[in-house]
């Protein structure tokens, strides 16, 4: 059965060099969900500048620095629509910088960051070695299924 994905995208950045099309996000999200039996999901992706993601990172994680992505999962929140799995906040500037540094395509790196974020929304984490190995394995498997290179070898 095809899962219905409701995706809302907010653009809150003027510093965008590359932005995936909505259909690309949907492919990446659908591929990330292949092991999940939830029929329908809702996700928000917000594209922001460094200042906003730095502020959010400090407010919610007490880290006073910008990051590539923040994930806010609502999957276990009984007060929110059961299909709404969460929000992904992505800093396009940092994703672009990282892609250049790693010498990978912008599309590939956006795919990886989106998949990484979706897995966080679904409860995967890299807070210890065992969890990191599981999460990186899944990310690599999903990326390969979409004909992208291993995101951890560059």
UniProtKB/Swiss-Prot annotation:
The keyword Coiled coil does not apply. One of its GO terms (molecular function) is zinc ion binding. Its EC number is 3.1.-.-. Its cofactor is Zn(2+). Zn(2+) binds at residues 116, 120, 126. Keywords: Cytoplasm, Endonuclease, Hydrolase, Metal-binding, Nuclease, Ribosome biogenesis, rRNA processing, Zinc. It is found in: Cytoplasm. It holds the Pfam family YbeY. One of its GO terms (cellular component) is cytoplasm. Binds 1 zinc ion. GO terms for biological process: rRNA processing. It comes from the Bacteria. InterPro entries: MetalPrtase_cat_dom_sf_prd (IPR023091), YbeY (IPR002036), YbeY_CS (IPR020549). The keyword Disulfide bond does not apply. It is an enzyme of class 3 (hydrolase). Single strand-specific metallo-endoribonuclease involved in late-stage 70S ribosome quality control and in maturation of the 3' terminus of the 16S rRNA. Belongs to the endoribonuclease YbeY family. This is Endoribonuclease YbeY. It comes from Buchnera aphidicola subsp. Baizongia pistaciae (strain Bp).
